[in-house]
Amino acid sequence: MRRALRAVLWSVAGLVLLYGTTAVVLFVLMGRSNLVAGKTLALVPGPAFALLPMETMWCQARKGDLAVGQAAPDFELAARDGSGRVRLSSVRQEKPVVLVFASYTCPPFRREMPGVRKVYEDYRDRAAFYFVYIEEAHARDVWPLESNVRDKVVYSTPQDLAERTGLATTCAKAMQIDFPMLVDDVDNSVARAYTAWPTRFYVVGRDGRIAFKSRPGPFGFEAAPLRQALAELLPSPAGSSAGTP
């Protein structure tokens, strides 16, 4: 009896130690992830354990489940503008597809979007671009940032597809996103399939295989590697200057 009780107590102690250590590591990583472009994006205090699912997704994204050369998971999502649903396996038939995964509350996305627009302008004739709006990176009820308060980008987690679509529309207008935007369902199935949270780029070839996969955000969301990948995958036609920085 004592042996069984001792085993239970050790198990409880182990769980307490695990969650305590995870919380400490989480705050260290959050401090690191807030160092973007040489600026400190200070955290607004919030409940630590509410962030554990977010940290889990970030760790999964760093590891990644997909590799270049593998078949890209097919999906069908609603277009933000209400024009219908879009299936990846259909749109890639004519051109390679560039997938931009992000959300409005992600500061690195907002910082890098002008460069992404320039890549789109240079390659729109040779690749199909789709923005996939995913779960918020820094919703005020989960992982708020002072930089979002300063930029007046303060939003709670959308509770259904309609709310997420509304926030996606706000994002599209504010960030001047000209290419089609799709909205991930609130089960976040596409973002999970692509380990895309908080931000990530993919290029899917006409053969349905992954031709390029960026590092995950916040550090991997950069337009320059995407441009380089497209320059290698889609050489400019003779006499064209498209694709140059």
Residue ranges, per PLM feature:
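N-terminal targeting signals for export/organelle localization
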Residues: 1-76
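Thiol-/selenol-based redox modules, centered on thioredoxin-like
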Residues: 34-35, 52, 185-245
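A generic structural motif
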Residues: 78, 89-92, 217-218
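Short, acidic, Ser/Thr-enriched surface-loop or helix-capping motifs
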Residues: 79-81, 204-205
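Generic structural signal for well-ordered beta-strand positions
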Residues: 85-87, 211-212
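Short active-site neighborhood of thiol/selenol oxidoreductases, capturing the structured segment around
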Residues: 86-116, 128-133
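Structural micro-motif
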Residues: 95-96, 177-180, 195-202
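Structural microenvironment flanking redox-active thiols in thiol-disulfide oxidoreductases
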Residues: 110-175
